[in-house]
């Protein structure tokens, strides 16, 4: 079957993963193949393998996360997740407010913002990622962890964009501010990365540099923090980030690259147990995740 425009989502039913595609914003197909392969097939010839189904209430799943024995989850298992940082002017300014390392009088964030080479870092593996309605985590040894709402791209092994999604690059900012060499510990741990609820194909995003991104932190039923930005403020363009990611660095099909944040809540807005994080990106949707503080190991 040939269509234009596709949204891909996945559910768990009685322990089994089932992938679906919403085609032309109306028809729902149960996919006959791995969702990463389905994205690649669609990218090549707009073909989708699967059967039309009814009875899947996608909008209700988004609201309640689970209906009977069906629960929405992350749309794919990305073999690798990579991040790019300080790609917006606002991030450079906010990160540089902290007492962090300097090089020749400039903070490391100011230096990388002005440098030719962007910041690219390894972020997560599938077991460290969660999806819509699943809990992101605050490290047991962090007292200042922030959500980082970002537009992310799903890539094939050549760096071609297969689709777009919403990502939360959860970061233990106190660890990173203490010492830049602690960045991997700040960025990589169980529950450090959320994405979804869907992956939308490139034909649904006519211009990735005109998307509104909104972050809300809800605490005890009230909006505790809210911020927004448009991707037209992105200085490090996605194509440049991809080129540096794949330079001398082979990536597998289905790799996700998240493209940086411009919304950086202050030190007094750190996440707490039972907070709710909501990230909305126009033309994609809203990713909602509860927050859980990991227990210290004694």
Swiss-Prot record:
One of its GO terms (molecular function) is magnesium ion binding. It catalyses: 2-dehydro-3-deoxy-D-arabinonate = 2,5-dioxopentanoate + H2O. It is an enzyme of class 4 (lyase). InterPro entries: FAH (IPR051121), Fumarylacetoacetase-like_C (IPR011234), Fumarylacetoacetase_C_sf (IPR036663). The gene is kdaD. Its EC number is 4.2.1.141. Homotetramer. Pfam families: FAA_hydrolase (PF01557). Keywords: Calcium, Carbohydrate metabolism, Lyase, Magnesium, Metal-binding. This is 2-dehydro-3-deoxy-D-arabinonate dehydratase. Mg(2+) binds at residues 148, 150, 169. Substrate binds at residues 86, 187, 261. Induction: Expression is strongly increased by growth on D-arabinose, both at the mRNA and at the protein level. Participates in a pentose oxidation pathway that converts D-arabinonate to 2-oxoglutarate.
């Amino acid at each position: 079957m040939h269509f234009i425009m596709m949204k891909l989502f996945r559910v768990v039913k009685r322990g089994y993963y089932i992938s679906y595609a919403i085609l032309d914003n109306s028809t729902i197909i149960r996919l006959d193949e791995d969702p990463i392969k389905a994205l690649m097939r669609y990218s090549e010839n707009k073909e989708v393998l699967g059967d039309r189904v009814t009875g899947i209430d996608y909008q209700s799943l988004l609201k309640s996360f689970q209906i009977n024995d069906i629960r929405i989850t992350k749309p794919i298992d990305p073999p690798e997740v990579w991040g790019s940082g300080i790609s917006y002017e606002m991030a450079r300014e906010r990160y540089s407010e902290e007492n962090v390392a300097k090089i020749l009088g400039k903070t490391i964030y100011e230096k990388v913002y002005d440098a030719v080479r962007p910041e690219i870092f390894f972020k997560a593996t599938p077991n460290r990622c969660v999806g819509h309605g699943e809990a992101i985590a605050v490290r047991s040894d962090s007292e200042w962890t922030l959500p980082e709402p970002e537009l992310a791209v799903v890539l094939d092994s050549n760096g071609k964009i297969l689709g777009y999604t919403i990502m939360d690059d959860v970061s233990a900012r106190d660890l990173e501010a203490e010492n830049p060499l602690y960045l991997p510990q700040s960025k990589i741990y169980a529950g450090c990365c959320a994405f979804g609820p869907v992956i939308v194909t490139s034909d649904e995003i006519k211009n990735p540099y005109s998307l509104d991104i909104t972050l809300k932190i809800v605490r005890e039923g009230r909006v505790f923090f809210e911020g927004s930005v448009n991707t037209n403020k992105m200085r490090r363009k996605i194509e440049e980030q991809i080129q540096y990611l794949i330079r001398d660095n082979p990536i597998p099909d289905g790799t996700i690259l998240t493209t940086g944040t411009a919304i950086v809540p202050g030190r007094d807005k750190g996440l707490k147990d039972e907070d709710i994080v909501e990230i909305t990106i126009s033309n994609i949707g809203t990713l909602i995740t509860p927050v859980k503080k990991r227990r210290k190991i004694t």
